[in-house]
Curated annotation (Swiss-Prot):
GO terms for biological process: symbiont entry into host. Disulfide bonds join 48-64, 119-133, 180-198, 258-268, 303-327. Its main location: secreted. Component of the PfRH5 adhesion complex composed of 1 copy of CyRPA, RH5 and RIPR; the complex is formed during merozoite invasion of host erythrocytes specifically at the interface between the parasite and host membranes. Following the establishment of the junction between the merozoite and the erythrocyte, CyRPA dissociates from the complex. Within the complex, interacts with RH5 and RIPR. Changing residue 66 to K: Prevents the interaction with c2 neutralizing antibodies. It is found in: Secreted; Cytoplasmic vesicle, Secretory vesicle, Microneme lumen; Cell membrane; Host cell membrane. Residues 1-28 form the signal peptide. This is Cysteine-rich protective antigen. It is a peripheral membrane protein. Disruption phenotype: Conditional knockdown causes loss of cell growth and severely impairs merozoite invasion of erythrocytes. Attachment to and deformation of erythrocyte membrane is normal, however the subsequent step, which triggers an increase in Ca(2+) from the attached merozoite into the erythrocyte, is impaired. It comes from Plasmodium falciparum (isolate 3D7). N-glycosylated. One of its GO terms (cellular component) is apical part of cell.
Length: 362
């Protein structure tokens, strides 16, 4: 069942009533309903080439990477906060480091604090034994304490890393931050079974020496893997990554679920979210049910949000001014078990935000 919404101002309760009555009338198989409420626009004067959104103390933040090449050829990593209909820049973290080039960014958000790591980015084949990182700590989202740390790279020496925002993962009553990587490609089986690995910190990112073993038997030879990101929800671990001939020719987008086997070991297997003529964008959960976003493979003026693989919303991005609207980089930002934001860039400097509510009907 596809439920299209194109109006900007519809009350939450009106939508709930319509959806519940509709589902009753057609005898929906699923007992779960999700709906989209008001659409809002946010403007950004900074040309971000990468956005990393998160919720902290009930407010929306963005880590913006500005690395456009120009006369100055400078890199900026801004921490921004949503204030009304704009992103307000609070801090430029990169200028407080001695790093060169575009770094890896790993952000960890807990109830009371934000911890952001900026780590030097070298090609995995040229990576040094140790990796220099700057650890930024904040308990208000505005001011950040900076300390330089060194991470021994023996665990992830041959792994390709990608930037992401994550929650802590609790294993046997201890919380860990994870940095995870994937073998970018293999031409022959080396029987190591370490194609995906994570190193972990139990002291909020100050030291990194714990190895998390990820057992994944569906790694294929002769293809490239990239953009690996862990998903942590209610202490369940999953991964999202891309598979293709090369980074510009994506053949598939994989999502794998992991089960804690013993100690610091997990067993992971594929979860099939692939749909014909649709490109998987992002995955999250609401009340233990998956919510998945897709772009239209042939027309990014449309994107879809599926809940429980049954009900879906069709989103046609609304124009802001005279710009051409699209649905690019769709990302879920979970508020709680009943609400999530769906954020995408509709045009340069313009972000569309949809609020999605979870509801039950009897």
């Amino acid at each position: 069942m596809i439920i299209p919404f194109h109006k900007k101002f519809i009350s939450f309760f009106q939508i709930v009533l319509v959806v519940l009555l509709l589902c009753r009338s057609i005898n929906c198989d699923s007992r779960h309903v999700f709906i989209r409420t008001e659409l809002s626009f946010i403007k950004n004067n900074v040309p971000c080439i990468r956005d990393m959104f998160f919720i902290y103390k009930r407010e929306l933040y963005n880590i913006c990477l500005d690395d456009l090449k120009g006369e100055e050829d400078e890199t900026h990593i801004y921490v921004q906060k949503k204030v009304k209909d704009s992103w307000i820049t609070l801090n430029d973290l990169f200028k407080e480091t001695d790093l060169t080039g575009r770094p890896h960014i790993f952000a960890y958000v807990d109830v009371e604090e934000i911890i952001i790591l900026l780590c030097e980015d070298e090609e995995f084949s040229n990576r040094k034994k140790d990796m220099t990182c700057h650890r930024f700590y904040s308990n208000d989202g505005k001011e950040y304490n900076n300390s330089e740390i060194t991470i021994s790279d023996y665990i992830l020496k041959d792994k390709l890393l990608s930037s992401y925002v994550s929650l802590p993962l609790k294993i046997e009553n201890r919380e860990y931050f994870l940095i995870c990587g994937v073998s970018p490609y293999k031409f022959k089986d080396d029987n190591k079974k370490d194609d995906i690995l994570c190193m972990a910190s139990h002291d909020k990112g100050e030291t990194w020496g714990t190895k998390i073993v990820i057992k994944y038997d569906n790694y294929k030879l002769g293809v490239q893997y990239f953009f690996l990101r862990p998903y942590i929800s209610k202490n369940d671990l999953s991964f999202h990554f891309y598979v293709g001939d090369n980074i510009n020719n994506v053949k598939n987008v994989n999502f794998i679920e992991c089960t804690h086997e013993k100690d610091l070991e997990f067993v992971c297997s594929n979860r099939d979210f692939l749909k014909d003529n649709k490109v998987l964008q992002d995955v999250s959960t609401l009340n233990d049910e998956y919510i998945v976003s897709y772009g239209n493979d042939n027309n990014f003026a449309e994107c879809y949000i599926f809940f429980n693989n049954e009900n879906s919303i069709l989103i046609k991005p609304e124009k802001y001014g005279n710009t051409t609207a699209g649905c690019y980089g769709g990302t879920f930002v979970k508020i709680d078990e009943n609400r999530t934001l769906f954020i995408y860039s509709s045009s340069q400097g313009i972000y569309n935000i949809h609020t999605i509510y979870y509801a039950n009907y009897e």
